[in-house]
Amino acid sequence: MGVRDQNLEALGAMYATFNIKQTASVDDLKDIDIGKAVTITSGYQVGPCTDNSVFLGKLVDLTLTDAENGKRVATIQIKGVMTVSITTTNPVVGNRVVGGASGTVKQAPALGASDPAGGNIARGTVIAVNGTTDCTIVM
């Protein structure tokens, strides 16, 4: 009898709903972005992760359709086990992550003088890495 594949992403998931950041009255998150990493952009508002942003969680759903700008809300997985796309510098198992470009995450920078007054921006713990494609994180 072989070892069963584990569906860790079903463990301890917590979801929250946020408004979507807009640029020129157009939502910054679209259906194509489902599954990407997101960051908090202002009070109760999210957008795609950008370089060195704080990784909030994974976009799992959007209400309505892409055509209904300003009326949609985003459901974000903010806790539990999740898999998201990665970019350079790729994290390794045991690392923490920060936002990368275009809705990805990357290895968190070393602690130091660059940390903001509010604290270190690194989040989660990487528990698996799939080459240079994605990583699985527990938050």
Language model regions located:
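Surface-exposed, low-hydrophobicity beta-strand/loop segments enriched in small/polar/acidic residues
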Residues: 1-139
